[in-house]
């Protein structure tokens, strides 16, 4: 999709092959309302033909003998009432169907996005796809279905009107089809161009969203204000938006030129047709009522033709989108097709072995990890140290199942990671990430999200809060677990960075897991809080596998075993004293840290 391809009839029909899949998806999600809309539109489609015949008879009766005039007026009134009722009913059902379908598809999309791998979210192309499918899914599927229904309804009404004109002159009826066919070809070309432009600018649209996000949230406000860079971002936003406007105006100009050209041809045909009808009236071959109804029929043909062209344009344009949506939804069915064994998921893990492990990030040729061999045992506290970029965080993401190894294996009590279902990692591993989430939710939710089955066990929540010293969450010397945290919502309580980190730690420890992993757990903590956390972590490691990443070698000294990493490889493994004697790289890290501490 990197370049605009020339529109062809073959490509057009190939794109329309998504229609059966679209209809199948819609009927799976909202079958009842889809049927309601089809029935209502089918009934409505035949009303115009009935109206033409009634209107014709009404005028001829008024100008003629007046026989059956009352009956015709009553029938005309009934038809108008039915038309109004059907229109209102169709509008209500259509609105309800739109809302329900949008909800159902968004739920499906969220399930798909939640089943993606972490590596998917580390690629810009995936963000662009997610941006487009989530943004357009709120209206495109309904727009496509509605366009199909209206297209069929308009087609029936068009044939009815052509049949009505054909009763006077079949040649004129055929002539009136020229403009719709010509319009179709021209507008489909524009439709393809419009879709490709919108799809290709997904990255830029995401950039505008990000700028708005920066300018409207507290986390970035301080730097933007102090550095006086709001105008920089506003200018950047305006430049991108102007580019979008210029692209949209170019498409609008093309549509306008086509419309002017087609309207000229259409009006020319209409004038010639009406002139021929007038000649027939003057020759006594056509009644006035017939003339008026035929002119109305021509007007309806023009209306239905334009409606059909617009809807074919919409069908084609939205079908291009649906191709991308279906490609994205397929990801849900291919992710984590592994053995599903409840017993495996629930057993307590005692050993993790990393064997000949190497990892290369997508779209990269460099090894982030290379030939890693390690073991982690229950009852053992392991620290992983090294400079930034040494592969520490990548390693724990592989151990926790967020990445799959490029080469080598991970064994959990001799069970290979490649065969483990996602549920295994979710039940057995609890991780504090360096970029932990600050949930703008209640205390209960902030802690209980790691184990939803225990979210309403107040005693369990309070116990972990007390163990980690989260007294700052108390109100009148007690925890009110439904207190809102953060300042995004009403009655929220703002917290410091260190307080948010302690809450994230409490959430990590609240989960009953076999393996606990902390990535820079003391980055925002004061010395007292750091000691409390590590004391609790050491106690926790007696019956579990416990791993933590740290830049601080003083913190690492608390571990039974220290893994030293350098440039994606394991430099050495041992206790602090052993490493200080035999590992030159560890010595460099240690003395560098001591120098910095003394310098302070």
Curated annotation (Swiss-Prot):
**Intracellular or extracellular location(s):** Cell membrane
Q: Which UniProt keywords apply?
A: ATP-binding, Bacteriocin transport, Cell membrane, Membrane, Nucleotide-binding, Protein transport, Transmembrane, Transmembrane helix, Transport
| Recorded GO CC terms | plasma membrane
Keyword Transmembrane helix found: yes
Q: Residue limits of the ABC transmembrane type-1 domain?
A: 34-317
State the annotated membrane topology for this chain.
Multi-pass membrane protein
UniProt GO MF annotations = ABC-type oligopeptide transporter activity; ATP binding; ATP hydrolysis activity
ABC transporter domain location, by residue?
352-592
Q: Which PANTHER family match?
A: ATP-BINDING CASSETTE SUB-FAMILY B MEMBER 10, MITOCHONDRIAL, ATP-DEPENDENT PERMEASE MDL1, MITOCHONDRIAL
- Role played: Probably implicated in the export process of the lantibiotic nisin.
| Sequence similarity | Belongs to the ABC transporter superfamily. Nisin exporter (TC 3.A.1.111.3) family.
Q: What is this protein called?
A: Nisin transport ATP-binding protein NisT
Which organism does this sequence originate in?
Answer: Lactococcus lactis subsp. lactis
Q: What lineage is on file?
A: Bacteria, Bacillati, Bacillota, Bacilli, Lactobacillales
Q: Which gene holds the coding sequence for this protein?
A: nisT
